[in-house]
């Protein structure tokens, strides 16, 4: 499972906060995590990148060529917890997305907590099973609680573990309704997120969304053993899990960006001299959980 999540988190900026004088501290630290972006994909598609994205990170950033998780059975929940806490499951408690509770002999979800209600969702989520401090928590301590921390992701576990225990909010897309969701654990749902749900959420636009190849067929040669079939997907069928399929398409990354812009423009993120954290998770996995051979063209576009 090496390379399940490729982390591009810029944590080195944060670790030097206490050693710097306040005026030199960054106003905003942005954490970028890309779910299922494998290292071989990152290299295979390199000729398609623009100069201000991955190429800039490769040239100007710190690249760790042999990084890997030091535990087995890596999935999204355990990987996110490891990335943001800097610890392994034996320490942070998040061994998987789901596991068997030894006390009840029932399966439990890594983010389940019935003590907290959901906003725009019936999920009851909180980071209470995460046993260690996170980057977000340490930022809150360093700024005496004044730094703003928001985490935005397609999935609940990715948002919750990135926001940590002390974050101001964690937001993920409800796979049933398409609305951005949250939990009462972090307090009130921000007005700007509610406004986005009411006016611009994907549920009001999804019937007009169509996904077709970005490039001519001849440019889809980067993955071996791919099926040469041009695809076309629409998301207007309520009977076919349209929001769940949408979340595994590249369009979900546009939604993450859109809510991030709302957080910056209306949520006061990065607006003062106190360092804030905006943790964003994107999706680069297989569409509708198909095999690589079935959706190689889709993976390249994503």
Residue ranges of predicted features:
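Bacterial Sec-dependent N-terminal signal peptides
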Residues: 1-24
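Generic, well-ordered alpha-helical scaffold segments in large soluble proteins
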Residues: 3, 7, 40, 60, ...
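His/Asp/Glu-rich, glycine-adjacent segments
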Residues: 87-88, 93-274, 283-288
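Beta-strand elements within well-structured catalytic alpha/beta cores of enzymes
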Residues: 26-38, 57, 83, 139, ...
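Short secondary-structure boundary/capping segments
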Residues: 45-49, 164-176, 292-300
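Short, structured active-site-proximal loop/turn typified by the sulfatase FGly-forming signature C/S-X-P-X-R
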Residues: 42-91, 148-152
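Second-shell loop/turn segments in exported
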Residues: 38-44, 69, 121-127, 243-250, ...
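Stable alpha-helical elements in mature extracytoplasmic
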Residues: 33, 37-41, 50-54, 76-80, ...
């Amino acid at each position: 499972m090496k390379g399940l999540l490729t982390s591009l988190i810029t944590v080195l900026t944060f670790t030097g906060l206490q050693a710097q004088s306040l005026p030199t501290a960054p106003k905003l630290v942005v954490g970028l995590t890309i779910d299922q972006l494998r290292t071989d994909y990152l290299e295979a598609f390199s000729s398609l990148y623009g100069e201000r994205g991955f190429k800039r990170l490769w040239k100007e950033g710190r690249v760790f060529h042999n990084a890997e998780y030091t535990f087995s059975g890596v999935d999204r929940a355990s990987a996110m917890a490891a990335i943001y806490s800097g610890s392994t499951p034996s320490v942070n408690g998040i061994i998987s997305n789901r596991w068997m509770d030894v006390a009840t002999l029932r399966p439990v979800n890594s983010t389940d907590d019935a003590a907290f209600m959901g906003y725009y969702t019936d999920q009851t989520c909180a980071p209470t099973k995460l046993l260690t401090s996170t980057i977000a928590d340490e930022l809150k301590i360093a700024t005496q609680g004044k730094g703003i921390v928001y985490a935005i992701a397609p999935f609940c576990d990715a948002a919750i573990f990135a926001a940590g225990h002390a974050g101001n909010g964690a937001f993920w897309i409800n796979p049933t309704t398409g609305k951005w969701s949250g939990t009462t654990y972090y307090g009130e749902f921000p007005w700007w997120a509610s406004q986005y749900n009411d006016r611009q959420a994907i549920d009001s636009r999804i019937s007009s969304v169509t996904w077709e190849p970005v490039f001519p067929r001849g440019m889809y040669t980067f993955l071996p053993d791919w099926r040469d079939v041009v695809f076309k997907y629409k998301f207007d069928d309520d009977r076919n899990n349209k929001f769940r399929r949408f979340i595994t398409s590249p369009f979900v990354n546009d939604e993450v960006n859109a809510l991030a812009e709302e957080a910056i423009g209306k949520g006061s993120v990065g607006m003062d001299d106190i360092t804030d954290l905006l943790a964003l998770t994107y999706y680069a996995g297989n569409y509708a959980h198909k095999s690589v051979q079935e959706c190689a063209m889709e993976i390249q576009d994503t």
